[in-house]
């Protein structure tokens, strides 16, 4: 499962946590690397190219949950 697929399991109309917030933001971003399973690629994208700001420490926590899923 890609990180994008994992995030899409957390999408919701009302933000209930950080994963939901990131999922909703990524869903609206057509350039997000949807096929990636690579931490560095996604982290770099969020840091340098994403059209939104998201705290990378929170991303690290969500990534750890992704790895455990």
UniProtKB/Swiss-Prot annotation:
The record's Gene3D superfamilies line, in alphabetical order, gives:
YozE SAM-like
Family stated for the protein in its record = Belongs to the UPF0346 family.
Q: What is this protein called?
A: UPF0346 protein YuiB
InterPro entries according to UniProt: UPF0346, YozE_SAM-like, YozE_SAM-like_sf
Under the heading HAMAP family, the entry gives: UPF0346
Pfam families referenced in this protein's UniProt entry, alphabetically? YozE_SAM_like
Question: Where is the chain membrane-spanning?
Answer: none
Gene (name only): yuiB
Q: Which organism is it from?
A: Lactococcus lactis subsp. lactis (strain IL1403)
- Coiled-coil annotation reads none
Q: Which cysteines are joined by disulfide bonds?
A: none
């Amino acid at each position: 499962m890609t990180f994008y697929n994992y995030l899409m399991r957390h999408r919701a109309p009302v933000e209930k946590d950080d994963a939901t917030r990131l999922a909703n933001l990524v869903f609206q971003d057509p350039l997000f690397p949807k096929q990636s399973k690579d931490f560095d690629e996604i982290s770099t994208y969020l840091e340098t190219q994403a059209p939104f700001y998201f705290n990378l420490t929170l991303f690290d926590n969500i990534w750890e949950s992704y790895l455990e899923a």
